[in-house]
A protein has these predicted regions:
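Elongated, amphipathic alpha-helical interaction scaffolds
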Residues: 1-231
Length: 231
């Protein structure tokens, strides 16, 4: 198969496609509060000062529908990270790694507006397609020793909760029910089943109509998907 990272970035760097992904995964209350029709892709370089090891794959921000207390538009920052994991278990330190993506977002916001007194919300979404599903920690607190025995510590220890989109756990009906247009729908299907050609062939009938729409409406993307499958 082709480069999973290239597939992910090509498709989901398009804000309209990323918005469909976010509508599928974010809590409904947050989706209702965000104006995802105005989702904006930010430049990773300007956020992370060219530190590749601290850059999420894609960084977006979306305005809240209601104005802030000062009458200004508030934004929520939404890093999307594709975690391609070929081992049988997810990395045990993903929440800590995610914190390294979040901190530069805050630093960038303060650099952009040195007068601001608050930090923007950041919601970290990890798109995972490991072979056996996500079994790793979903929060920093799960990694910190002693919190169960001494709960009073929880209020004083930093936490970060990940949103995990485990595409390997999606069946055909669940995936097809997502609010995705044909191109991103096909991309998620390929990410899910691309490990095994037998799986792609077995699930092809379920996605036949979607693929026909891609060929008709987005022939360049159809060719890209074909090359992805061929390599």
């Amino acid at each position: 198969m082709g480069d999973h990272d290239a597939l992910f970035k090509r498709v989901f760097a398009v804000p309209e496609n990323a918005a469909g992904m976010l509508r599928s995964v974010l809590p409904a209350e947050l989706v209702a509060a965000l104006d995802l029709s105005r989702l904006e892709l930010l430049s990773g370089e300007s956020i992370t000062d060219n530190l590749d090891e601290q850059r999420a794959d894609l960084l977006f921000r979306a305005p809240l529908r209601e104005l802030g207390e000062d009458g200004q538009v508030d934004h929520v920052y939404l890093p999307l990270h594709l975690l391609v994991e070929h081992q049988s278990t997810p990395p045990p330190r993903m929440p800590l790694r995610a914190l390294r993506y979040v901190l530069p977002v805050w630093q960038g916001a303060l650099s952009e507006d040195p007068a601001r007194k608050t930090l923007p919300p950041v919601v970290m979404l990890v798109v995972y397609h490991g072979p056996r599903g996500w079994t790793g920690p979903r929060s920093l607190h799960e990694m910190v020793a002693g919190l169960d025995k001494l709960p009073v510590l929880r209020a004083h220890v930093p936490n970060l909760v990940l949103l995990i989109d485990d595409v390997s756990a999606l069946d055909d009906a669940t995936l097809l029910a997502r609010p995705l247009s044909p191109v991103p729908m096909t991309a998620v299907w390929l990410l899910r089943d691309s490990r095994h050609m037998d799986a792609l062939i077995a699930h092809l009938p379920a996605f036949q109509e979607v693929l026909e729409q891609v060929v008709e409406e987005s022939p360049d993307e159809a060719l890209f998907f074909l090359r992805y499958i061929s390599f």
